[in-house]
Regions:
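Transmembrane-helix boundary/entry motifs in multi-pass membrane transporters
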Residues: 2, 37, 65-93, 110-118, ...
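Select transmembrane alpha-helical segments in multipass membrane proteins
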Residues: 5-16, 41, 78-91, 120-124, ...
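Hydrophobic, membrane-embedded alpha-helices of multi-pass small-molecule transporters
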Residues: 11-21, 90, 159-168, 175-243, ...
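Transmembrane alpha-helical segments of multi-pass small-molecule transport proteins
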Residues: 11-14, 18-20, 48, 84-87, ...
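Hydrophobic transmembrane alpha-helices that form the core helical bundles
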Residues: 31, 65, 80-113, 281-301, ...
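Selective recognition of specific alpha-helical transmembrane segments in multi-pass small-molecule
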Residues: 53, 57-58, 150-161, 224-248, ...
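TM-loop-TM module centered on a large, flexible mid-protein loop between adjacent transmembrane helices
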Residues: 69-76, 235-285, 301, 329, ...
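Hydrophobic alpha-helical segments and their helix-loop junctions in multi-pass secondary transporters
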Residues: 94, 98, 152-177, 195-196, ...
């Protein structure tokens, strides 16, 4: 691999990291560290499996299917596969992750701007999402290019300064079971929804790699770049999980959706806390824009078969998003938890099956109990 290819590989790894790294995802390692305390290593082990390893394995599995979402899910059968794909993009879009992003934006800003009304804020956020999703806008890309590095830099600063100035008194978990903390981390990783996102990020990633001259070496390129992206994601999650453990005595009574803003204020001060809050807010906004646009595009092409235009679907999507945002972050998370606990194991099994069993002879044949038994 020459110098240019090495640079390309690193750049691609950073790009994949940026795609998976959402501002909202920082909430979950913080919440985990606050719960597991001195058992944080066990919690992290489970969390990293479902929040880091599985999304990148999902990306590799999708890569074997050339990013063809419908073909990937068709292993379950044509109708069940399309139904599951629709459920996944719905949870990522207006029925889950997108309104959760808006609710988190509101919660983070509320620490610096108390009394900010959720309904008015949600209407404004949905209006902005419509403007930026209605037609491709360079501002969205600019926000992504500028805010993602800024957010990562600020979060790294919080981690470093947080470790340097961490309080001497730490709490110990009242639950001595390592297994229960591992399981908590495993299920908390579901909340990042990154495995779900991997299926719909893959076509974007693969389209950027299409180069006939590199096809023979593409597998190694993607694997190395994925390892780079996964390693960066893991380091950030580990840092914030341990920060929440170290600062747990000062975070008592703070809701999960306000943990990031609260810890930023404690470590960097109130003024820096506002900067972090605004940065995270815009980062969440760009994530919500991408998710809603992906949902509307999927419904238009795969469900409605172009019979209904993009704009009406986008408007309906945002009306649903607004309605669910009013439930607030905690309630949205409580609704998503049981759904993710059912979906994730199925998607993990489907991912491994597609990763190790794809063949040109049976790509379109759905999984049967006999095939599944042979695979296991």
């Amino acid at each position: 691999m020459n110098t240019l290819k090495k640079f390309d590989c690193i750049a691609f790894g950073l790009a994949v990291f940026a795609m998976f790294f959402g501002a909202g995802n920082i909430i979950f390692p913080l919440a985990l560290g606050q719960i597991t305390l001195n058992k944080t290593p066990w919690g992290l082990l489970g969390f990293l499996l479902t929040a880091v390893a599985m999304p990148f394995i999902g990306l590799l599995a999708m890569f074997r299917y050339k990013g063809k979402i419908r073909l990937f899910f068709a292993r379950l059968g044509k109708i069940p596969g399309l139904s599951l794909a629709t459920l996944v993009i719905s949870l990522l879009g207006p029925f889950g992750a997108a309104p959760r992003c808006i609710a988190l934006m509101h919660s983070t800003l509320s620490l610096s701007f108390p009394g900010l009304p959720l309904i008015l804020f949600s209407i404004s956020a949905c209006g902005l999402i419509f403007l930026f999703s209605f037609k491709e806008n360079r501002l969205v890309k600019l926000l992504g290019y500028v805010l993602s590095p800024l957010m990562v830099a600020l979060l790294i600063l919080i981690i470093i300064k947080g470790f340097i100035s961490s309080p001497e008194t730490v709490l110990e978990s009242s639950n001595p079971s390592n297994g229960s903390h591992f399981w908590k981390g495993l299920t908390e990783g579901y909340n990042t929804m990154d495995l779900l996102a991997a299926f719909f990020f893959a076509p974007i990633v693969i389209s950027s790699l299409k180069n006939p001259e590199k096809d023979q070496n593409l597998n190694g390129f993607v694997i190395i770049a994925s390892i780079i992206g996964a390693s960066l994601l893991a380091l950030v999650y580990i840092g914030f999980c341990y920060l929440a453990y170290l600062y747990a005595p000062q975070l008592t009574g703070i809701a999960n959706d306000q943990l990031l803003g609260a810890i930023a204020i404690k470590i960097l001060g109130p003024h820096a806390g506002i900067i972090v809050g605004l940065t995270v807010t815009f980062a969440c906004l760009t994530t919500a824009i991408a998710l809603i646009a992906a949902f509307a595009s999927f419904i238009k092409k795969e469900i409605m078969k172009e019979r209904i235009g993009y704009t009406p679907i986008l408007i309906i999507s945002l009306l649903i998003t607004f309605a669910i945002t009013t439930l607030e972050f905690q309630r949205i998370s409580r609704i998503l938890n049981p759904l993710l606990e059912v979906c994730y194991p199925v998607l993990i099994l489907l991912t491994f099956y597609n990763l190790f069993k794809p063949s040109l002879n049976d790509e379109l044949q759905p999984i049967t109990l006999e095939k599944l038994n042979d695979f296991i």
